Amino acid sequence: MTTGRFEPGKLLDFFTWFDKTNSNHLAAVALLQEECEAIDPDMMSDYASWVRLYRNKTSPAVSLKFTPQLFEKLTGYPARRFDPEFCHDCAYLFEETGFSEHLEPSRMLMANLMHESSNFRYLKEIASGEAYNGRLDLSNTEPGDGPKFRGCGPLQVTGRGHFEAFYNWLRDSEGIDDPKIVELGTNYVAEKYPFSIAVNWINRNNLLQVCLEDGFDACCYRINGGWNGYPDRINKYEICRKYMK
């Protein structure tokens, strides 16, 4: 067998010749894994986007890729602002809520995420959260729960109850036991799980179905409960329609 120079972008061709009985091939793949994990520890995890797609037995209807370059186009901020963990968590949200299978609803959701967070500039509520202390409807039963569990992520998920539900869901569904979610609250989750903290809220509110059946305006209303910032949401929706393909 004659092999030519490996060209960037032809990783699939490279693995066509992979021989699991060849010790050099095995060592090379092990080295590749080490280098991938050095770049991004989550790249080889069970919930990484490419791993989930690889294991999926059905063909995806939409092939959205959440990359730093896409976020640069959507927000106008430089790509370096959006690290791999941020992009992975965004992809995780869209996959776990079913949005990744529907292009137009994905654009609707992204536009609202962008508006609610000022293009992902604010992933923690600016207010102190003191006003949420003692709010039983948020399950804030402990002193200091208000600031600890103030608005988190692009959708500003708020309250001990939501954080405990997210912790339980992540442990039971994904096998990820991360007690810091409840121990540290918003300051930790906004960095580690800015998007996935909203999975439960989106699913409980049937947001995908709302988008599919009733469209963009209904999506905005379900998220906002009104029409605050509607012109900006529309503007961001048009940006998403231009770049999310």
For the regions a language model picked out, list residue spans one by one.
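Exposed beta-sheet edge/beta-hairpin loop segments within beta-rich domains
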Residues: 185-190
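A structural motif
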Residues: 147-176, 191
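Alpha-helical structural motif
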Residues: 67, 86, 149-150, 162, ...
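Cell-wall glycan-active module
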Residues: 1-136, 169-180, 203-245
